[in-house]
Amino acid sequence: MKYKRIVFKVGTSSITHSDGSLSRGKIQTITCQLAALHHAGHELVLVSSGAVAAGFGALGFKKRPVKIADKQASAAVGQGLLMEEYTANLSSDGIVSAQILLSRADFADKRRYQNAGGALSVLLQRRAVPIINENDTVSVEELKIGDNDTLSAQVAAMIQADLLVLLTDIDGLYTGNPNSNPDAVRLDKIEHINHEIIEMAGGSGSANGTGGMLTKIKAATIAAESGVPVYICSSLKPDALAEAAEHQADGSFFVPRAKGLRTQKQWLAFYSESRGSVYVDEGAEHALSEQGKSLLMSGIAGIEGHFSRMDTVTVYSKATKQPLGKGRVLFGSAAAEDLLKSRKAKGVFIHRDDWISITPEIRLLLTEF
């Protein structure tokens, strides 16, 4: 078995008709493949969009609504209808499904993050298939994850999946938009995600990318940095899920980081909210970036913001003003500033176990998406 634990993400277009309504036929195609993989011994998670599409017609809307309240109401109705369809199909094959609705707050709060990961682990151990969506009905725009590509990558990283498969209506990442550029070539294997890759996907003001591809590159970055390989492939092929599971998919494959980030480091890098800024001298910069050591109080050159003990802060080089990483502090800002003023600044400020260096890929996540 090439990949045992797999997260599949299907977008709204993969399970709806051209008029935006839910397609039971498309859902059945997906669940039949999931059932076959489940019976073959794979552990599966499905991240599925489509709640609004499933619900807007039942509320009497003639087309997909655009107002936030209308979309949230449609999602409230549609999520149940969507789960009903998935549950009925999977249960006919003797498979238990579970609904999990997540929001950005579930990742930002460390305890909730750990609890969600624990629940998912139990479900997979008990051979259930978790079906996950963002909690659209209660999420406010400013606090949303924003897209299920990102959510699927966060889940894949959280449970240390063996593979993330992003199913879409295009068979991978191209050098240009294949719908308008006949010279566009698909990239079958991507080893490093950089500015050029982002531009191909439609970032940095580019007009070359295809709709939705940029969020998939963001998702691939999160997953690959966490040690999870990623496929972007078309959901239109009848055996797309099975082919991806055996590393035979017709799509773009993203090679993961050789040593993926542990769960604690993932949380620091991608989800923890920075409460302040700390500037360090050259000696501390070298110790953090080159030697993998803890940040000592004696290396601090300046503090900005108000934070408490065990809050996350961003650490910058005093010389270059560039971010070096993020970490959880052992002193609040007030206590640290008092120690610095008294010239009794001794001890560890950020332990190396609570520190993550900002790699070029993580820097792209912070600046480009």
From Swiss-Prot:
Family to which this protein belongs: Belongs to the glutamate 5-kinase family.
An example molecular function term from Gene Ontology annotations: ATP binding
The protein's name in its UniProt record: Glutamate 5-kinase
Keyword ATP-binding: yes
Coarse class of the protein's main subcellular location: cytoplasm
BP-aspect Gene Ontology terms: L-proline biosynthetic process; proline biosynthetic process
One GO cellular component term noted in the UniProt record for this chain: cytosol
Membrane-crossing segments per the record: none
Superkingdom, natural source: Bacteria
Entry function: Catalyzes the transfer of a phosphate group to glutamate to form L-glutamate 5-phosphate.
Gene coding for it: proB
Species name: Neisseria meningitidis serogroup B (strain ATCC BAA-335 / MC58)
UniProt keyword list: Amino-acid biosynthesis, ATP-binding, Cytoplasm, Kinase, Nucleotide-binding, Proline biosynthesis, Transferase
